[in-house]
A protein has these predicted regions:
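NTP/phosphate- and nucleic-acid-binding module
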Residues: 1-227
Length: 227
């Protein structure tokens, strides 16, 4: 009985750690009349979609039904001998069944944000957990004359995570483009980069910036995208 609640909690924690909003999530235990004939208990993790609550993950306690049926059909003994208690039994199966498309839609829905800035402008941001962001960092040369150095840094960082390069338009417009697609980090190459090798890293969610070496940037981003 302990493994069914374990997997219920494991699946919920997994969603939340990857950016699912706990306020939009809930457990729903199936009523007795809803249960499949093989199930001792089934719980759905439901998400509050724009149109209402819907299942994103189902966890079912299938008891020993699956292995018993396999044993009866194949003639192969599916029992397990506990080396400590010397007890022999057919193991129970807990089945967490999830649809990838629903999960993606859930994460997209939770990540989307329209933020009103101090100047009255609206900033569209996809606040993906860095682990899920398709592109982890954007390399942005402040001027085109820094393009060669920027490309060198892009190439260096691309060994560790997905990096994009953008030199079109003002730096502000480039920040906004990266915010809209959910890139968590922007790395700006400027005159000081040419002098001492440091770059500016800008954080998508807070828009705050820090100055550091490329190696420090690499270590910081690698830490943020580790799961």
């Amino acid at each position: 009985d302990e493994w069914f609640p374990y997997w219920r909690n494991f699946c919920m924690d997994w969603i939340v750690k990857l950016g699912g909003n706990p306020e939009n999530l809930r457990f729903r235990d199936h009523e007795k009349e809803e249960l499949s004939f093989y199930s001792k208990g089934t719980t759905d993790i439901e998400y509050k979609f724009p149109w209402g609550w819907g299942e994103v993950w189902g966890i079912a306690d299938r008891t020993d039904y699956d292995l018993t049926q396999h044993q009866n059909t194949s003639g192969k003994d599916m029992s397990y001998l506990d080396p400590i208690t010397n007890e022999k039994y057919i193991p129970y199966v807990v089945e967490p069944a999830v649809g990838v498309e629903r999960l993606f839609f859930m994460f997209f829905t939770d990540a989307y944000d329209e933020e009103t800035l101090e100047n009255g402008e609206t900033r569209v941001v996809m606040r993906f957990n860095p682990v899920l962001a398709p592109v982890k960092a954007a390399i942005l040369p402040l001027r085109k004359k820094y393009a060669e150095k920027a490309e060198e840094i892009r190439h260096e960082l691309s060994y560790d995570f997905a990096v994009t390069y953008d030199e079109a338009g003002s730096i502000g417009k480039r920040y906004r483009r990266q915010d809209e697609v959910g890139t968590p980090f922007c790395i700006t190459i400027d005159e000081q980069t040419m002098e001492d090798g440091t770059v500016t890293i800008r954080y998508r969610d807070s828009m705050e910036q820090e100055r550091m070496t490329v190696e420090e940037v690499r270590n910081k981003i690698c830490k943020e995208i580790r799961f």
